Amino acid sequence: MCYGYGCGCGSFCRLGYGCGYEGCRYGCGHRGCGDGCCCPSCYRRYRFTGFY
């Protein structure tokens, strides 16, 4: 998932949970958290910082 702590290139991104996973896309689109590392496409689309 790409929200909360995992939003800033954190543990989830390093463990391999990329934007292809449903949790990561959910975090970018619905939580307003665009992670430039885990979800680059979502980050460019929503223009949110979301780095924790």
Curated annotation (Swiss-Prot):
Keywords: Keratin, Repeat
Lineage top rank: taxon: Eukaryota
Record's keyword annotation contains Repeat: yes
GO cellular component, one term: cytosol
Species of the source: Homo sapiens
Taxonomic placement: Eukaryota, Metazoa, Chordata, Craniata, Vertebrata
Function: In the hair cortex, hair keratin intermediate filaments are embedded in an interfilamentous matrix, consisting of hair keratin-associated proteins (KRTAP), which are essential for the formation of a rigid and resistant hair shaft through their extensive disulfide bond cross-linking with abundant cysteine residues of hair keratins. The matrix proteins include the high-sulfur and high-glycine-tyrosine keratins.
Record-given protein name: Keratin-associated protein 19-2
Signal peptide: none
InterPro entries: KRTAP_type8/19/20/21/22
The encoding gene: KRTAP19-2
Protein family per UniProt: Belongs to the KRTAP type 19 family.
Subunit organization: Interacts with hair keratins.
One Pfam assignment: KRTAP
